[in-house]
């Protein structure tokens, strides 16, 4: 999508590593999918909390993985 491509461009402009780019785009896509494909501008803290809780409780990801997902979401909203 155009949104994902603009995020990819922003990551590359800021010289993030390829591994970080791949990871951030994965988590942003997963976040959007989890929220029924709503545009991020139409989502807020409650959707982010629900997503992170889902990762911890249902998918049982590690704290580091949960933090990586959060960092990706923060990057998306700041850029």
Give the location of each predicted region.
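N-terminal core-binding DNA-recognition domain of tyrosine recombinases/integrases
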Residues: 5-79
